[in-house]
Regions:
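Short, well-ordered beta-strand elements
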Residues: 1-8, 25-31, 97-99
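Extracytoplasmic "Venus flytrap"
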Residues: 1-17, 35-37
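An extracytoplasmic/periplasmic, membrane-proximal ligand-sensing/linker region
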Residues: 8-12, 156-161, 173, 204, ...
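Short helix-initiation/N-cap motifs at beta->coil->alpha
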Residues: 29-40, 127-154
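Beta->alpha turn/N-cap motifs
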Residues: 34-35, 45-46, 50-59, 76, ...
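Ligand-binding "clamshell"
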Residues: 60-72, 87, 158, 163, ...
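A conserved helix-loop-strand patch within extracytoplasmic ligand-binding domains
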Residues: 72-122
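A bilobed periplasmic-binding-protein/Venus flytrap-type ligand-binding module shared by bacterial periplasmic
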Residues: 79-90, 193-211
Length: 258
């Protein structure tokens, strides 16, 4: 099975590949450095499945590309946090400070909600997928800099803070528990951010791909990911149809805001 990810090279990924092998599935991994690539590769049949994204990211891709990629099953959900090398608490971030956030629309929207909940920005318009253009500058304490998600850890050296996805925390040796603020992955509002294994719509019920979801939830893989996320990652066992129902609501919402 040809699988695309942004996580190859991590110990947790190696454990997943090993456990799949024990279950009779040989995984051939293609690692992508850019979040924009794995869905295109899947649509173009260069890979069979991918594992790197949450449901909102998938919804944005499907709507923008008129695609029908579908969730096979859920894997996990993680909090999204604000990190800083310059400040030790939210209160230390100065008026007019600058925070880096991911520039892709779904992660940008979630990062803005994190900053809003942390009391650093105000948003106008009430959109479900806000962008930096929806920030009420007059009512906000900080400004945001949009950067590629992979670059957010590097920006910590030069500005007040950054909202960083879990994928890049481990790669940058940042402790997930050092976040100045993070959203709550157990809240109903976190449903769009459930990560999923994804296939082309016509292959979403492929028994081998379904088995991959089971492998992901095996004790060895669960333990490897828990170790890497320092216990911040929550296992989610929703089925493909359950995930598809959430995805349908997300896509409807995105279309209504276009």
């Amino acid at each position: 099975v040809r699988i695309g990810t942004t996580e190859a090279g991590k110990d947790s990924w190696d454990v997943f590949v090993d456990e799949a092998g024990k279950a009779g599935i040989t995984l051939v991994t293609t690692n992508f450095t850019d979040y924009g690539q794995p869905n295109v590769a899947l649509t173009q049949k260069q890979i069979d499945v991918n594992l790197f994204q949450h449901l909102r990211f998938l919804g944005e891709y499907n709507v923008a590309s008129n695609a029908t990629l579908a969730p096979v099953g859920a894997t996990y959900v993680v909090p999204l946090g604000l990190y800083s090398q310059k400040h030790r608490a939210l209160a230390d971030i100065p008026q007019g400070g600058q925070i880096a956030i991911p520039n892709d629309p779904p992660n940008q929207a979630r990062a803005l909600f994190v900053l809003k909940a942390a009391g650093l920005i105000a948003l106008k318009g009430g959109r479900a997928t806000p962008s930096a253009a929806d920030i009420d500058k007059g009512a906000s304490r900080v400004t945001v800099a949009l950067v590629d998600a992979a670059q957010t850890p590097l920006s910590l050296k030069s500005i007040d803070g950054a909202v960083i996805n879990n994928t890049y925390l481990a790669q940058s040796d940042i402790d997930p528990k050092s976040a100045l603020y993070a959203d709550d992955p157990t809240s109903p509002g976190a449903e769009p951010y459930i990560n999923v294994i994804v296939a082309r719509a016509e292959e979403k019920d492929n028994p081998t791909y379904q088995k991959l979801v089971d492998v992901f939830h095996s004790p060895a893989v669960t333990e490897a990911y828990a170790k890497e996320s320092k216990g911040t990652q929550l296992v989610v066992t929703k089925s493909g149809p359950d995930c598809a129902a959430i995805l349908g609501r997300i896509e409807q919402q995105i279309r209504s805001e276009k």
